[in-house]
Amino acid sequence: MAELPQSRINERNITSEMRESFLDYAMSVIVARALPDVRDGLKPVHRRILYGLNEQGMTPDKSYKKSARIVGDVMGKYHPHGDSSIYEAMVRMAQDFSYRYPLVDGQGNFGSMDGDGAAAMRYTEARMTKITLELLRDINKDTIDFIDNYDGNEREPSVLPARFPNLLANGASGIAVGMATNIPPHNLTELINGVLSLSKNPDISIAELMEDIEGPDFPTAGLILGKSGIRRAYETGRGSIQMRSRAVIEERGGGRQRIVVTEIPFQVNKARMIEKIAELVRDKKIDGITDLRDETSLRTGVRVVIDVRKDANASVILNNLYKQTPLQTSFGVNMIALVNGRPKLINLKEALVHYLEHQKTVVRRRTQYNLRKAKDRAHILEGLRIALDHIDEIISTIRESDTDKVAMESLQQRFKLSEKQAQAILDMRLRRLTGLERDKIEAEYNELLNYISELETILADEEVLLQLVRDELTEIRDRFGDDRRTEIQLGGFEDLEDEDLIPEEQIVITLSHNNYIKRLPVSTYRAQNRGGRGVQGMNTLEEDFVSQLVTLSTHDHVLFFTNKGRVYKLKGYEVPELSRQSKGIPVVNAIELENDEVISTMIAVKDLESEDNFLVFATKRGVVKRSALSNFSRINRNGKIAISFREDDELIAVRLTSGQEDILIGTSHASLIRFPESTLRPLGRTATGVKGITLREGDEVVGLDVAHANSVDEVLVVTENGYGKRTPVNDYRLSNRGGKGIKTATITERNGNVVCITTVTGEEDLMIVTNAGVIIRLDVADISQNGRAAQGVRLIRLGDDQFVSTVAKVKEDAEDETNEDEQSTSTVSEDGTEQQREAVVNDETPGNAIHTEVIDSEENDEDGRIEVRQDFMDRVEEDIQQSSDEDEE
């Protein structure tokens, strides 16, 4: 291999060479490829395409020309970077779903919202749109600078006159080296109104500009959620705008619904969006969708139909789709454009200021051009006027001249004419010597003088020039302006909360002794008569049992108060929904409990900010405290201190009050004290309370509740052996806080110690939970009303080693009650046939007849009997559901 001459080798440091070469490449990409000019909103490739269309005369009133011809001409003259990049840029300018105001009028297949590519350039045709003419108007009147093309054989515009603000009207996107731009499209009417306001008030604020320019206006319409993202983008040049599809929920007969999507967010691929929905349905991440189809057509426009199952909540499904699919997405605004050839981040006002300055420059240069042309013409007309005034001498001079050159010199010398004037006289036809032509020349001359005066006035007075810019912008607005397509919805839509995705329904949250938690729909538990065996509420682990239960809405807050005096918070829907037989999940997976900490009370609250509500605390040692509910509105995931007390004490219960209640505190030895809540001074969140009741030896607090001063409520007492009774609240006199209380029940071996003391109205249902995990739901009104000293009546039949662990009130809901005969039950015999057994009456219990369901079986123990009944009830429910589905079909 021959060695290169030494003179052709330049030694350079590789670091310097890489730095300089990369910078040259980066600047080339930034300036000459990826970023739009702030003045006309175009990248070089788009500018060259439009100029090429103009040079080829492909105006809207001319016929379409092959795209291949356009691309070839642009590539050969101005853009030597490959035909595909030119054609792709032209295709995008022709897509009405990509450009708010398309700049190319395409004929043929130019792609679709489903991501389909355009047909090959040999098949499609194109020409300019009408609005494109406004980008190029006056380009031949010295309004902009021209530069050499890549090989120096052609001239191309450095920028277009851009008689409307194209940068913001159609937006722009591009990725350069180390930077990127993403500018949303806007409504032309609003933009021009904004420019007009800016021209009248240069000190206008962004907020004032937003009175004219509401926000982006996307070609695919859709919705924008809130204005905070828009305002941030307009003020800083950067921001995120939440876009959402337009969807409606329609009825489709038979109680069924469908979701119909008619507009989708800008730049969303419709086909991929539908695929994403189908994928979520297939993976069971979204439930309740039975059918999904695309009914989009030229006649109907975008129409995506999502059929919803009859028992599903269409609104919740739609919110899930918003959160998990491109039905809702964001547009990241990054307004970077070339300003004086340099990339710069600009805000809304800066973009309009630069555009307005460009228009003033265009109009000024056009005026100067027109003035030059007018003066040149006036100069010629002055020569013609001289010739007409001396026509005989002019003719004589010309006839005496041997050549054109001699004639021109003679005319210049004899009549003091310029070369152009002399040439115009020589070029003048004889017919212009008539009197009529003389009048025309005189009229044209006078008209030109007036025109020159107007042009000079424009150039001399900046305000006159600015008014001319306003008038021309107004004319464009009136011709091409339209109504905005994208609707801006005001409100707290920027962040879709989890709560929006969850249907609001009544639920039951259970907590086991070993701290396993779950939630179930409240309808899981059917109302039964007293003495029933109940249904299996959960399958507990060995030595575990349900200890607490609370009813609330999925959207309510749940406050968890622990024996250590701490408080934690969850939303109802944040507790996992599991099956009735499931044991639940460890509560430490939901809230961050400390060591040796267990939940003592769960309270459902709708509004934690309420200033009218209080929380009353009671500890095992008889200490009480009252604190404002608002003190607990902000609780971290790791909890906060709710009450302070001695090491040998622990929190027993907490109640929500209105501030005007009577406080009831009950003990395991059946003592109860009642005193006004007003005697408790509100204390801070971490404060220690005061003495609420004086306890006897071996006694401890087991219950805390509230009642109104003249309440007709009753005190419900339930003992550990399943007995209970109701006693009017007014049977318990008011006393001073800190007393020993009065007797509320007679405690014997038969009924056991008190496990629950609470107030009832008689209109609730009662849920009684045993240590075996059995739950029974019964009507409080069915419980006998007895005096304070009574033992109570049997509420639930307990097996050996069973006891009542907790009791909870449930709002009565007729829809949850079954229509089955509660006085009989069915069992399954060995041959599979159902046998009907009569209920027996428990004569041990006084009062009204108590219907008790008893299943005798030699092969099953008590747990087995419960399982047999549960299996049968599950199959009955399945049969009922199947019959209902068949009827619907």
Swiss-Prot record:
Catalytic activity of the protein: ATP-dependent breakage, passage and rejoining of double-stranded DNA
Domain Topo IIA-type catalytic: 35-501
Residues annotated as catalytic: 123 (o-(5'-phospho-dna)-tyrosine intermediate)
The protein's enzyme class: isomerase
Localization: Cytoplasm
Primary location: cytoplasm
One CC-aspect GO term: cytoplasm
EC number: 5.6.2.2
Compositional bias annotation for Acidic residues: 813-823, 876-889
SMART domains (UniProt xref): TOP4c (SM00434)
Further remark: Few gyrases are as efficient as E.coli at forming negative supercoils. Not all organisms have 2 type II topoisomerases; in organisms with a single type II topoisomerase this enzyme also has to decatenate newly replicated chromosomes.
Purpose of the protein: A type II topoisomerase that negatively supercoils closed circular double-stranded (ds) DNA in an ATP-dependent manner to modulate DNA topology and maintain chromosomes in an underwound state. Negative supercoiling favors strand separation, and DNA replication, transcription, recombination and repair, all of which involve strand separation. Also able to catalyze the interconversion of other topological isomers of dsDNA rings, including catenanes and knotted rings. Type II topoisomerases break and join 2 DNA strands simultaneously in an ATP-dependent manner.
Quaternary state and interactors: Heterotetramer, composed of two GyrA and two GyrB chains. In the heterotetramer, GyrA contains the active site tyrosine that forms a transient covalent intermediate with DNA, while GyrB binds cofactors and catalyzes ATP hydrolysis.
Name of the molecule in the record: DNA gyrase subunit A
Gene: gyrA
